[in-house]
Amino acid sequence: HVFRRSDVARLRLTLREGLAPIELHVVHLDLYFFHDLDLVQMNLEVRADNLPLATVREILFRFGRAYPSGWDEEGEGLHNVYLAEWLGADGQVIARSDSAQRTKYLSFVCEHRSPNISEHWACLLRPLVLAHSDEVGALRYRLIEYHRMPVMAYIAMDQPRTLSREDWIRTGLATMLHPDEALPVNVPWIAEFEKRYCQDRYWTNTASGPNTRFISTGNAMTVVGDADSRFFLDNERGVLAQFRHQYFLVFLIAHLHRASLLVFSEVLVDAVNDLDIRNDVSVRRFKRRIRANFETFLRFTHRYWFHELSERPHVQAIFRMCARHLRNDALYDEVRSEIREMSNYLDSDSQRRQSNTVVRLTVITILGLIATVTTGYFGMNIIPFGEGSVLERILHGLIASSIFVGLVLFAVARSKRLSDFLEAVSEEKLSFSKKTRALWKALLGKEA
């Protein structure tokens, strides 16, 4: 299911303290619910015109963080925007960020061992409320990964062919590189930038074009093209339309795979942490959670997990690049192995319980065989049950039934020890005295 919120019209960002705020238009704000997977993904699209490239990179780096990654000496949040404000159609502020409230975030983490999120993001998600918060809400959520949100960027710029290699790197890796830091030219992912992250099927670097470059790091996808190209700007049939409706789905599916696998892994961890092997209720709850998680994983594998997404080689290459950088295949193998181990544990535990049941039934059968042979030898009419009054026969039946039930229950209670005794009897190397001690232990529960 997809739910759309329409009361948020604009986003006002103050990137750093003292800078003039920037207003971006909110195109749409959606929540994607995957009920099968207990997963929610938020999709926010904003746009702006005539921004400097440096400002675009700053927005990509600072915006889209669920909570501050730290605080500076003045108490302001690190790496996030100084202030983010959601505005309604009438210009009124709906919510604003609170990254400077350091105590709020730290106290929440200390109490719940889970991160809090900034107020402007929490406002967008209401009536959903954070899992450990004090807010009242029927639906609760929690982050399944770190604070950096996946981001897609569509950049139409004048003369993209004039960009230097450093500009390309800083634009494509804007979410990873701090705008004020020098470029780390010696690290492999910078030296191999074009090979690792660029898909240049539609980049010719010629005057006739096309000059559209796709850059994917897994957590971010950036499409850069020529602002003078009508096809690049066409929102019905051009690259912009493909970006919104096709490449968005490619990016969404790749992150759906990763998010789902992280959910499965987290459910396993929670189930193990909640397990108390000395508590039967906890053990039964653990088994139910593991089996339910296994069933959901099977549905995910057959419904959502696939590698071939499109017949177009370029789209398929983009999808594979995203999935490779997100390590989806390795994560899938890891989660599948964990679930298989849990399933094998439950199967072995069930087999152990069945074996114990078979042992008990075997002991009871042997005791019943003794009783059957004995009564068969002496005949079934030793006691004239058919004679006497009706009351005497009823009383006789109740007493006999009570005795037999008591013997069966005693045999069940001592079945493990009686099984050990039968094993001792079948052992030819044991002496008669040791076999007698085994019988004594089976009946009384202690050594002779």
Predicted features along the sequence, with ranges:
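Alpha-helix capping and helix-coil boundary motifs
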Residues: 50-59, 164, 169, 279-282, ...
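Hydrophobic alpha-helical transmembrane segments and their immediately adjacent juxtamembrane loops
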Residues: 329-448
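Extended hydrophobic/Leu-rich segments
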Residues: 190-193, 295-298, 315, 421-425
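Long, charged/polar, low-complexity intrinsically disordered N-terminal extensions
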Residues: 1-12
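Generic serine detector
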Residues: 6, 69, 97-99, 107, ...
